[in-house]
Amino acid sequence: VMGSVCSVAIGIHFEGLPMIIHLPLAILSGMLGGMIWGAIPGLLKVTTGAHEVIVTIMMNYLASLFAGWTVYAGGTQGQTPGPLWDRTARAISETPDVFESAQIPWLFGPPYRVHYGVFLALIAVFIVWWLIYKTTIGFEIRTVGQNPKAARYAGIRVEKTVVLTMGLAGALAGLAGTIETLGLNHKFAPEFGGQVGFDGITVALLGQTHPFGVVIASFLFGALDAGAAKMQFESGVAADIIQVIQALVLAFVAAPLIIKALFRLRSSGDEGHATKLNTSWGGS
């Protein structure tokens, strides 16, 4: 959401800039907005101990409210409209279309709706893979994620790594919103995003949190979502069945971890029971 708002703020201004300057500037502004917004939960975690999951959920609501304010139409009581509101849209809360110089060009036009943002996403995947698995920073990120205490003992600055990681994650989320806005919608409206963020969590889990695995999982979920409406129209099958399929896929992926956890608990219980019996036998 923040990436979309920041990119649109640049895209609807600076008319006359060439695309080679305007488009990268809009993309970078979206990533910067996402990075700042994502770094805040990391900063709160290392300074106050606030749980990052709870804080990020709260930040989601704040981002939605802030974005809604930027395109607020003003209402019927003469309230001041938002700074990005399209004055020609009357009572509709949305921004104007970004200038053509800030739009990501189509790769395949309608009905396919495929644009060059696909390549930006693939480049981001490769960069993340290289950063996480081929650099010292990536090693520190993985170490802090697996065992913060061991990372601190090894001399890694845990606080700095946490803030950096959250900021990078925010930048990637901002890039996703930017690509969606500049490539497809060309404007921002309050209903932007929907469940995309939560779908991203599901896709990451399905892809085993590996950059290349996420690509495969995202294509699977994207194909299911894209075919849902057509399936309902042509075959009469409810589109909600797609959500059921996605939930089942995730359940099957998580099943091995659940089974391992159950067996681990059972083994711990058996060992504790055996220890109790041995102690009782020895004491008698």
Predicted regions and their residues:
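Cytosolic-side transmembrane-helix boundaries in multi-pass membrane proteins
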Residues: 146, 153-160, 226-284
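Membrane-embedded helix boundary and interhelical linker motif in transport proteins
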Residues: 1-39, 69
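Transmembrane helix-bundle core of multi-pass membrane transporters
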Residues: 56-134, 241, 276-282
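Membrane-water interface segments at the C-terminal ends of transmembrane alpha-helices
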Residues: 7-11, 53-79, 125-128, 162, ...
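Membrane-interface helix caps of multi-pass small-molecule transporters
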Residues: 9, 13, 36-47, 69-70, ...
